[in-house]
Amino acid sequence: MAKVCQVTGKRPVTGHNVSHAKNHTKRRFLPNLHSHRFWVESEKRFVKLRISTKGMRIIDKKGIDTVLAELRARGEKV
C-alpha cells in the first residue's frame, strides 16, 4: 500500500541521518498516516480514508462532503 495521503497527497521524502561526526546516511521521512473512517451523512455510510493528520484538519475545516467531492473530481475511487 502506497504511503500517500489521499487528501493532501503527502508522500515520503528523502533526507539524511547526521551523526555527531557529521556522517550522512540516507533515510526516509514518512508522512503521519492513519486509516480513519468518516461518517458521510449525505450518503448514510462510512468512508474509509488513509490520510495524514493534516488531512484530518482539512476535513474538520472544509467538511467531509467537500473533500469527497474534490477526491472524486480528481478521479479517485471513494
From Swiss-Prot:
The keyword Nucleotide-binding does not apply. GO terms for molecular function: structural constituent of ribosome. Residues 1-22 are annotated as: Disordered. It comes from the Bacteria. One of its GO terms (biological process) is translation. GO terms for cellular component: cytosolic large ribosomal subunit. Disulfide bonds: none annotated. InterPro entries: Ribosomal_bL28 (IPR026569), Ribosomal_bL28/bL31-like_sf (IPR034704), Ribosomal_bL28_bact-type (IPR001383), Ribosomal_bL28_sf (IPR037147). Keywords: Ribonucleoprotein, Ribosomal protein. Belongs to the bacterial ribosomal protein bL28 family. NCBIfam families: L28 (TIGR00009). This is Large ribosomal subunit protein bL28.
